[in-house]
Amino acid sequence: SSSGVKMMGETYELDMRMNFAVPAMPDRTDEGKPTFSQAAQAIIKESGVNRGVCVVYGFGSGELAYELARQSDLVVFGFDDDKERVGKARKWLYGKGVYGTRVSVTLVEDMKSIPATGNIANLLVSENILTGKVRPGNAVEMNRLLRPGGGVAILGTPPGVPQGVPEQEIADWLAAGEIKNTKLPGGEWFKVEPGPMADSGEWTHQYGNAGNTTSSDEKLGGATQTDQLEVQWVGRPGADFGIDRQPRMPAPLSAWGR
């Protein structure tokens, strides 16, 4: 200022570009109902997925989503078409201190047409199927949300958990969408594991491959212009992959869908 008094302190830049960490859970998180705690534990163990994006297709009360976040490093997104159910779930999760950071839910008009890009879920579950309330939407839309070549859906009731939607109804639901699945031992549950995306490419070296061809052989799903493409993901977990040193930055690498 004109008086010579310093009005502002030092400016510090906090660069989060290389932070892949998920938001932390509250210091104190209480274990939920045994049904959801046991189910989440079994789902994580059977799927082998404990980090990345989890989609709850048929969100229900939000208690399964909470337990999955509590027992893992997953960021959980849910979809449900019942306004009252979504409102109650949001209020409950907000009280637990996790809503909007590790768990969130979107109210949708139709579970058969989720307003989200596909291929996003490392893990997909359904509380509504677990609790036996309803088979949400259809299996085709569920499968669209799963990441190809590594995504896993676990649907139904694990061993030791009270029965939800009957096994045959889940099997019929999957069969109607022609979704390949595996019946898991014990309980009444199924695993869905989509294979790799057809004609997808890989970028495994600085210049594409060991031959430095600068080509990934990616077919782009047949797209020939930019308006046929869509944004896959924006936000955390994620980073600016450019390491700011020297004149040339290492290329981000991708293999087997990752």
Residue ranges and their predicted role:
Residues 134-152:
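A short glycine-rich, Lys/Arg-flanked "PGG" loop and its adjoining helix->strand segment in the class I
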Residues 156-157:
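Acidic carboxylate diad motif detector
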Residues 1-59, 69-72, 94, 171-175, ...:
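Extracellular/periplasmic ectodomains of large secreted or surface enzymes and adhesion receptors
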